[in-house]
Each structure stands twice: as C-alpha cells, then as structure tokens.
Amino acid sequence: MPRLRSLTLDEFDPELRAMLNADQKSEREMRPTSVRAHHPELAKAYVRFTAAFKQHAVLSTRLRELVRLRIAFHNQCRSCMAMRYADAVDAGVTEDLVCSLEKPHEAPDLTDAERVALRYADLMCTNHLAIGDALYAELATHFSDKEVVELGSWCAICIGFGRLAATWNMVEDLPERFQAGADTTVTPWGPDAWVTQAPVKTH
C-alpha cells in the first residue's frame, strides 16, 4: 500500500492545481504529484524544472523515453514503468521498441547512439564510477557536449526521483502485474502500459 497519503484536488495548492491542469486528469495521472503536493512550493518548482527541461531539450523525445524506461527498470519504479508519455508514443516509442530494452545491446531496432546512451544509463544506475574516458569518448562520437550534459542530467533526474517514487509505492491504480511485491522483478515491456499527456502550465 502507499506509504504517504495522496492529497485530493480540494487539498491542492490552487496554483499547483492550475499549473497541472489537474481537473482534466485522472487520479492515476495525478498520483505522483498528489503526494508531492504535500509540499506545494517544492512541487511547483519540480513542475517548472521538468517543463523547462523538455522545452529546451536537444536530445530526441524517443531517446529520452527509452532512457527513462531503462532506468525505471533498474529502479523498479512501478509507476514509472507502467506509464508512457504521449509525445514519446507519437515520436515512435512503440511497445515493440520498449521490448528492445530487455537486451538493448542486441536490439536491431535501436541506433548505435541509442545503444551507447543506454549503456551509459545502465552504468549511471549500477556503477557510476565505472564510467570513464572510454565511454565518454564513445558518447562524443554520437553526441555533442551539450547533448552529453543533457543525457547525464536526464539520467540523474530519472534515477533520483524514480527511486523516491519507488519507495512511495504508488501502485494502487496500476495494472495488476505492477502491484507485485518488492521481491518480484517487474519489467516495463508488456502489453499493459498506459499513456499520459502530462501537460503543464508554467506561466
């Protein structure tokens, strides 16, 4: 069961509620924010930060979603794994492509750039001090310095906030397999993911 209570919309800070267009969303879409809403100023800062990150992104939406889902698997963040963003689906992140994340180094439908980015993400999750000159040199063959900074920052966001979300155990609205106990390893690849638009208003 969840470890922190989700606020109802009536309990939300009005500005946060408007920023998230919360009245137009389902309880499932609002679940992580309904916990963050206990601290409205931090929640609003998080919304603005992630919105700015997407607005100024130089990496493709497809790559960011692949990295997010691969990290969600390492984190075992059930709410992260069960969700797909609509803009990523529109950018070509199909469930067949998500299945490639099981063994990304072998997947024929991933590009060389995506494979090295996912290897970097894997190490960020599991052994960040093993990331050395050789991997950064390989990243440089596919990405600009600006893109590498964005990739690392995206990994940091997904790892940190994903692990936090995993400890909150917000699984009550998720498909059944994502509600399995912590001793069961769950994967993001499968037929039961759901799509969220997640629009925000930052002005």
PLM regions: where:
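Hydrophobic alpha-helical segments
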Residues: M1-H203
